[in-house]
Amino acid sequence: MKPIRKDNEIEWWNFDKCHDGIGTVNCKSLLDGCDSMKFCFMHCDDMKAGVSIGVHEHSNTEEIYYLVSGKGILTYDGIEYEMLPGDVSLCNMGHSHGFLATEDSILVVVG
């Protein structure tokens, strides 16, 4: 893999009902390297208001959500938290999380 990926070289793709969520998440895979890196992926999610990543458990992986823009509700182990731009959340192994965009949002996900 090259040491840099240019934004204009990365294609967007649609993820319908992500983790049984609502609507379609428009995704851009920034990094993908399960075989060669300690983490498996990094992607940018463009989510319209009302679109969600369904609540799901991380039994043997961890995942980070970083909200670039917009506003949303993070559900972590059944408790809801407001997320604003610049907020970050780590879902540790054995825990569950999901995200609902309450405004048009850009969410970066690393796992």
Regions found by a protein language model. Name each.
Residues N60-I73, D77:
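Glycine- and acidic-residue-biased ligand/ion/polar-headgroup-sensing regions
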Residues M1-F39, G54:
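A short, N-terminal "cap"/entry segment at the start of jelly-roll beta-barrel domains
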Residues K48, N60, L67, N92-G94, ...:
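A short, compositionally biased micro-patch
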Residues S36, M93-G111:
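Ligand-binding loop in jelly-roll beta-barrel domains
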Residues S29, F41-S59:
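Conserved short histidine dyad/triad with adjacent acidic residue
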Residues V68-S69, L84-P85, E103:
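A cytosolic small-molecule/anion-sensing beta-strand core signal
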Residues G78-G94:
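Short acidic-glycine-tyrosine-enriched beta hairpin
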